[in-house]
């Protein structure tokens, strides 16, 4: 199913049920199971709602059970610690009273500190690169696959992704475990830093399973 940016922003608008308890809507993005990126993004929003003055700087997530895209998700936030400059939160996502996902994040005051990133590999300007849908369509034009599968691979996403290296979606060649892409929201995402972080959390699972 296609997902516009407006659809994703609606998914990130959680309902507060009680102190540290939130509910998120679900959407059929990759079939009957909830797309993992949706749960990561919603869990980040739930945790951040309890730390309004700090910004997430690290997180880790564990998928415990498949989620049902036909049902909402309950997010229980546990306030592990609030220190002088850091806060730690744990979030458990539940459906039908059972945990489907476990999440932890650390939040930090805005201040200078050490930063780490991989070296820049001389990526070309994005204006000269094709978007992922165009690249995928070119690879699939001679593939004998069902139209439903083809449509799933080519469906619209809430972010525009422009890969630096073209990679076949069905038969990728052996390569180093590094992927360079340019990406941006496919529309106006506003100025809230939390929403931008949640969009990145959502996108993280797009690349992991290459959909």
Which stretches of residues belong to each language-model region?
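Non-catalytic linker/capping segments at the edges of enzyme domains
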Residues: 1-20, 118-194
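Intrinsic-disorder/low-complexity, polar/charged segments enriched in Ser/Thr/Lys/Arg/Asp/Glu/Gln
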Residues: 19-23, 58, 72-74, 102, ...
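N-terminal, Lys/Arg-enriched amphipathic/low-complexity engagement segments
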Residues: 19-51, 56
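HotDog/MaoC-like acyl-thioester-processing domains
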Residues: 34, 42, 67-140, 195
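Small beta-barrel nucleic-acid-binding modules, principally OB-folds
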Residues: 52-66
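Conserved small/polar residues in nucleotide/adenosyl-binding loops
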Residues: 209-211
């Amino acid at each position: 199913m296609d997902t516009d940016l407006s659809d994703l922003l609606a998914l990130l608008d959680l309902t507060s049920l009680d102190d540290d308890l939130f509910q998120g809507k679900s959407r059929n993005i990759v079939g009957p199971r909830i797309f993992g990126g949706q749960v990561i993004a919603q869990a980040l929003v739930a945790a951040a709602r309890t730390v309004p003055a700090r910004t997430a700087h690290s997180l880790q997530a564990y998928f415990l059970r498949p989620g049902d895209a036909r049902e909402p998700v309950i997010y229980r936030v546990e306030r592990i610690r609030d220190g002088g400059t850091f806060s730690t939160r744990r979030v458990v996502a539940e459906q039908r009273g059972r945990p489907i996902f476990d999440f932890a994040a650390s939040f930090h005051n805005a201040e200078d500190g050490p930063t780490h990133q991989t070296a820049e590999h001389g990526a070309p300007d994005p204006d000269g690169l094709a978007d992922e849908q165009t690249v995928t369509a070119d690879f699939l034009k001679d593939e004998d696959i069902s139209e439903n599968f083809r449509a799933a691979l080519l469906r619209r996403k809430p972010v525009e992704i422009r890969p630096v290296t073209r990679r076949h979606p069905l038969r990728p060649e052996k390569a180093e475990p590094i992927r360079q892409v340019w990406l941006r929201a496919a529309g106006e995402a506003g100025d809230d830093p939390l929403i931008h972080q949640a969009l990145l959390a959502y996108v993280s699972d797009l690349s992991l399973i290459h959909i």
